[in-house]
Amino acid sequence: MSEQAQPQASADQQQHQHNHHHHHHHHHHNENQSQQQVPIDPAANPANRIGRYQILKTLGEGSFGKVKLAQHLGTGQKVALKIINRKTLAKSDMQGRVEREISYLRLLRHPHIIKLYDVIKSKDEIIMVIEFAGKELFDYIVQRGKMPEDEARRFFQQIIAAVEYCHRHKIVHRDLKPENLLLDDQLNVKIADFGLSNIMTDGNFLKTSCGSPNYMPAPEVISGKLYAGPEVDVWSAGVILYVMLCGRLPFDDEFIPALFKKISNGVYTLPNYLSAGAKHLLTRMLVVNPLNRITIHEIMEDDWFKQDMPDYLLPPDLSKNKNSKIDVDEDVIRALSVTMGYDRDCKIVNVIEKANKQVAAGNSSSQQSKSSNEILDAYLLMKENHALVKDLKKSKSENIESFLSQSPPPSPFPNRGSTSSAPGVQQSLTYQTLATVPDLSTLPNSTIAILPTSLPSIHRAYMAETKQNGDPSQQHAPPPTKKSKTRWHFGIRSRSYPLDVMGEIYRALKNLGAEWAKPTEEELWTIRVRWKYDTSAQFECGSAPNLMKMQIQLFQLEPNNYLVSFKFSGWESAHGNAGTDSPQSHRQQDLDEVGSFSAYPFLHLATRLIMELAVNSQSG
C-alpha cells in the first residue's frame, strides 16, 4: 500500500477551505504536518478512538452524520470515517437498503474513485472507513486559474474513465462538482461520494441538493422532471471541463432563479482561445435537452478527448465478451465470499454455471432470479477489478503506485464480530465488520441498479435493441412480453396548468384538516404534509405518534402532462415531548408498531385526498 503524503497549507489557504466547506462534507482536509506518517502511541487518548483508529478531528457533517479524520494506530495511515447515525436511517426506513448498497460499493476499485476500505457496525452507528485525499480540484483551479488544455484533458480523462466505470456497473453519481473531485499527492483525480450520498431510494424519483450558487444542476434537474440517470453526470462533467479550461463557471448569477434560468436556456459563451476540439466537445456536453446530449461512450471516442489517453483508462471491449463463457476465478470467488458473504458452492459457482449454460443456449442471463443477477454482477465487477490491477502493473507510468487501487488498511475487526484492541484499552462499543451479510432474502431489494437512461424515447430504443441483440450487461431486463399500450404511473395524472394543480391540492388539504410546511424556493412543487390519524384504536399508550407525514410532489412527464406523487414520510407525535414520561422501551415499542402494523393509514388518507380532488374538479 502506498502511503499518502499530506500537502502543506498556509493559514490563508486553510481559512479559504474552511469557508468553502461550510455546507459540504468531504473526506479530505489540508494538514500542517510533515509528509511522513507517524504511527500513534497505542496508549494515547483511548476515549477518542474507534477500534484501532484514533480520531484526530471532525472534517464536516453530512445529512446522515459526521465525517472525521482518523489515523490507524499501527501504520499511521490516515483515513476518513463517515459515521452514519442509525436513528437517522430508521426514520427514513433506509437502514437495510443502505447496508446492502454499502456492501456493494465496497467492491468498487478504480484508480480514480475514493475507495471504501471497510464498514464497521455498532448498535447506534454504521462507520465507513474511506480513503483519505488531501487536496481538492476546486482549490487547485482557484490557485492556478485556467489550465492548459493538455493538463485539463489529463484530469478530464481520469474523471470520465471513473464515471464510465460506475455507469457500467449501474451506479450514477448525480452530484459531480469540483468539491467532490479530490487530488492525491501525485495530482491524480479521486472522485468522492460515488454512490452512497446518491442512493436512489424507492419513491424518490429525484433528490437534489442545491446548497450553493456554484452548484450547476442539469436543466432536467431544475425542471423537476421525473428523471434520474447518467445524462446528469455528462452535464456535470461538461461544467467541470469548462471550469478547468476557462477558470470560471459557464453559468453564473448571484440570484438563484436567474442562474437556473440561464442553465435551463443553455446560455453560455466559449472563449476564443479554446481549440476547435475543446469547443466541439463542450457544445456536445452542455446541451439542455438530455436526448441530444453526448453520452459517456461518445465522449471517450471524441478526438480531442483521446489525445494522449493512457491505456489503463480504456474500458474493456464489452462486444468481445458479450457471448463469451465466464471463467471461474478462485481468487475472485474467495474475495467475493469474504466481502459479500456469498457461499462459494451454493451461490457463486452455481450462478456462474447457470449463466454459462444460458450463454451456450443463446439465452439472456436476465432469466435468472434477481439475487442470482446480483451475485453475477458482483463477481464480474470484482473480476474486472483484478484485471485492471494486472493491466496497471504492466503499465510504464512513473506514478503507477498512485494509480493502483489500494487494499484496505490492516483491519482489527475479525469477520465474526469479535473486536481486538491494544492491551489495556477498554472500548465502550463493540464493532463488527459488514463482511458477513445476512441471506439476501432477508434484505430489501438493492436499488443500486439503474437503467441506462430513464428518458422514455431512448429507453424504448434501448429495450428494442436489447431484445434484438441481447445484452448481458443489462442483467435486470425482464423477459420479452407482449407489447401493451397501457402506460402506468405511480400517482395521479393531470393536464392542468401546474400552478392550478398545486392550488387544488392545497385547497383539498385544507378541507381535510391537514397541515403543511411552508415550501422553500427550491421546492415549490413539493408539499410536506402532516395529517392527524386516530391511533387510539391500536394503542393504549398516549405516547404513540398520531401525526402521519406525507410528501406530495408534482412531476412533469412530458409537455402539458403532469404527475402528482404521494409518498409516506413517517410518523410524528402531536404531543411533542409529552411522551417522555413513559419508559424509553415502551416508546420505542410503540414507534416500531406504528411503523410496521399496516400500510392502510397512508393509503386511507391518500384515498381521501384523491377523492377530495375529484369532488373539487367536478364542482369546479
UniProtKB/Swiss-Prot annotation:
Biased amino acid composition, Low complexity: 1-16
Disordered: annotated span: 1-45, 399-424, 466-486
Limits of the Protein kinase domain: 53-305
Membrane topology: Peripheral membrane protein
Annotated localization: Nucleus membrane
Residue positions, PTM Phosphothreonine: 208
Substrates-to-products reaction catalysed: L-seryl-[protein] + ATP = O-phospho-L-seryl-[protein] + ADP + H(+); L-threonyl-[protein] + ATP = O-phospho-L-threonyl-[protein] + ADP + H(+)
Biased segments, Basic residues type: 17-29
Binding locations of ATP: 59-67, 82
Xref: SUPFAM superfamilies: KA1-like, Protein kinase-like (PK-like)
Protein purpose: Essential for release from glucose repression. It interacts and has functional relationship to the regulatory protein SNF4. Could phosphorylate CAT8.
Family designation: Belongs to the protein kinase superfamily. CAMK Ser/Thr protein kinase family. SNF1 subfamily.
Name of the molecule in the record: Carbon catabolite-derepressing protein kinase
Designated gene of the protein: SNF1
